[in-house]
């Protein structure tokens, strides 16, 4: 493998835990703990992203090197790597949880590529760290496949996200109780190499504020601005104000994209919120099949549904408020923080309107259009309509003669389709009238809509089918699914099977409809 150029500013410029090794402990006055990955028995490459490899300056010959699986399976380090686990806290399901930290993620270092980019490499499932608590620091193949595939699928959908370089099987078993019901099972282990410019989270700042460590809080703020937001200029006070405003704006844009494509994160705790506004920590996520703002894929959240699909914009705002509370001791006033929170609301409204307009083939969404949108969403929920298939079919409607039959494949329940048929026909006529005001020809309208409405999304049942095969040693379906998701807006006629609505067998199956945090 060609050597990588490392410039590990996080470990160079921020204080380290004076203790080393993976034994569990409370870590104060430090941003990270030095810890090495724990070697595994038989690392082997399951899948990789050629696009992410290219970001690092590598090609297929580097990936094919026997050294690759050894490095990204945690068995050896490259020159320049300085492994560590980060220290942070967070609010989990609305409650302060204290110190959390990287319990099974180990950052290897920060790579500089030839285009001026900085990419942090992080192994997830690489063994115990000081933050593992009572866990083993490992990850199962099941959850690792889901994280690897969704990281790349989201990127190709145009959603801000962390990336994934590789998925490496460990040759070892990991014991997990998938639904916390007292039935633990031994499952194949795996390690994902996650890649992002930064893995700093809201929780990094929250823990320092909760502990009253104002000195390190100020250092972390200044470090984050200097390394991760180099375009922000001005006085120290102005930089901080613009930085928080930027964090709020990026978070708003990220969540608006989630809502556009039907993604439900599942566990929007503040320790799972990226300071860069990237989707991070793909655990019990899900994709909306039949449109339902109240749906959550996370069994842990099944009662309160705090992180349900339609609640995500509000939760992101709440999480930013917790970040603002943590930053207040360093900012000294609420003015800049409130301005940032106001920016979140403004940017989310603007981006959400623009994306909804694009999904409907409109140039812009006026206030007068909102009742039409609300009526559509209400009907979609009542009629149990597949979100992805519906919007893709909507691009094919003949505005002069709209035909409801075009949408037959999008319905999950024929009785509900018939019950709501008149309501939908009325909406479709209203929509056609509105579209005719745009003055676009059919091809222009279709192109606008198909650029906003994916044909292919990482449906849970598709991921589960790939997992089932991989657990039997067949990695072909994982690689095929990754390849389909590289072009989610293209028709890909030879891959139409990946664009089908959720089959009946997957409606209640574990891993296809509901998931847990067990991974």
UniProtKB/Swiss-Prot annotation:
UniProtKB keywords: ATP-binding, Magnesium, Manganese, Metal-binding, Nucleotide-binding, Nucleotidyltransferase, Transferase
Record field: transmembrane: none
Assigned EC number: 2.7.7.-, 2.7.7.108
Binding site for ATP: 101, 103-104, 124, 136-137, 194, 201, 281
Binding-site residues for Mg(2+), renumbered to this chain: 272, 281
InterPro entries linked: SelO
Lineage top rank: taxon: Bacteria
Catalytic residues, chain numbering: 271 (proton acceptor)
Pfam families: SelO
Cofactor dependence: Mg(2+); Mn(2+)
Catalytic activity: L-seryl-[protein] + ATP = 3-O-(5'-adenylyl)-L-seryl-[protein] + diphosphate; L-threonyl-[protein] + ATP = 3-O-(5'-adenylyl)-L-threonyl-[protein] + diphosphate; L-tyrosyl-[protein] + ATP = O-(5'-adenylyl)-L-tyrosyl-[protein] + diphosphate; L-histidyl-[protein] + UTP = N(tele)-(5'-uridylyl)-L-histidyl-[protein] + diphosphate
GO MF annotation terms: AMPylase activity; ATP binding; magnesium ion binding
rRNA processing found in the keyword field: no
Membership in a protein family: Belongs to the SELO family.
NCBIfam families: PRK00029.1
Function: Nucleotidyltransferase involved in the post-translational modification of proteins. It can catalyze the addition of adenosine monophosphate (AMP) or uridine monophosphate (UMP) to a protein, resulting in modifications known as AMPylation and UMPylation.
Name recorded for this polypeptide: Protein nucleotidyltransferase YdiU
Originating species: Azoarcus sp. (strain BH72)
Gene name per UniProt: ydiU
């Amino acid at each position: 493998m060609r050597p990588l150029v490392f410039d590990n500013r996080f470990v160079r410029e921020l204080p380290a835990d004076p203790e080393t090794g993976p034994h569990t402990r409370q870590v104060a006055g430090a941003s990270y703990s030095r810890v090495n990955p724990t070697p595994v028995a038989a690392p082997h490459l399951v899948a990789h992203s050629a696009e992410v490899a290219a970001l690092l300056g590598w090609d297929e010959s580097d990936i094919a090197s026997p050294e690759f699986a050894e490095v990204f399976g945690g068995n050896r380090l490259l020159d320049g790597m300085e492994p560590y686990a980060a220290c942070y806290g967070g609010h989990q399901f609305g409650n302060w949880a204290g110190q959390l930290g990287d319990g099974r993620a180990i950052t290897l270092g920060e790579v500089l590529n030839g285009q001026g980019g900085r990419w942090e490499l992080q192994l997830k499932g690489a063994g115990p760290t000081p933050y593992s608590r009572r866990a083993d620091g490992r990850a199962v193949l099941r959850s690792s496949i889901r994280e690897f595939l969704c990281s790349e699928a989201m990127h190709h959908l145009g959603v801000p996200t962390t990336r994934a370089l590789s998925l490496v099987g460990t040759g070892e078993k990991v014991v997990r109780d998938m639904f916390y019901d007292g039935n633990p099972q031994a499952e194949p282990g795996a390690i994902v190499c996650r890649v992002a410019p930064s893995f700093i989270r809201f929780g990094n700042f929250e823990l320092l504020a909760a502990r009253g460590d104002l000195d390190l809080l100020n250092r972390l703020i200044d470090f984050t601005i200097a390394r991760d937001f180099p375009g922000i200029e001005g006085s120290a006070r102005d930089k901080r104000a613009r930085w928080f405003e930027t964090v709020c704006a990026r978070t708003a844009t990220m969540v608006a994209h989630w809502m556009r494509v039907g993604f439900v994160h599942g566990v929007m705790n503040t320790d799972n919120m990226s300071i860069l506004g990237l989707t991070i920590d793909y655990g019990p996520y899900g994709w909306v099949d039949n449109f339902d703002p109240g749906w959550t894929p996370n069994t842990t959240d099944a009662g309160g549904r705090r992180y349900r699909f339609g609640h995500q914009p509000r939760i992101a705002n709440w999480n930013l408020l917790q970040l603002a509370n943590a930053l207040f001791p360093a900012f000294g006033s609420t003015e800049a923080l409130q301005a940032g929170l106001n920016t979140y609301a403004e940017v989310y409204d603007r981006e959400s309107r623009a994306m909804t307009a694009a999904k409907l083939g409109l140039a812009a969404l006026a206030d007068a259009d909102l009742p039409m949108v609300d009526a559509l969403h209400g009907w979609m929920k009542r009629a149990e309509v597949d979100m992805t298939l519906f919007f893709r079919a909507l691009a094919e409607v003949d505005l002069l003669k709209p035909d409801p039959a075009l949408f037959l494949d999008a319905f999950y329940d024929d009785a509900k389709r018939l019950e709501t048929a008149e309501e939908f026909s009325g909406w479709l006529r209203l929509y056609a009238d509105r579209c005719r005001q745009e003055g676009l020809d059919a091809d222009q309208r279709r192109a606008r809509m198909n650029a906003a409405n994916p044909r292919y999304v990482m449906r849970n049942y598709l991921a589960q089918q790939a997992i089932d095969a991989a657990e039997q040693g067949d990695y072909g379906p994982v690689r095929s699914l990754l390849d389909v998701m590289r072009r989610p807006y293209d028709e890909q006629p030879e891959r139409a099977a990946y664009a089908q609505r959720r089959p009946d067998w997957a409606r209640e199956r574990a891993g296809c409809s509901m998931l847990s945090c067990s991974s």
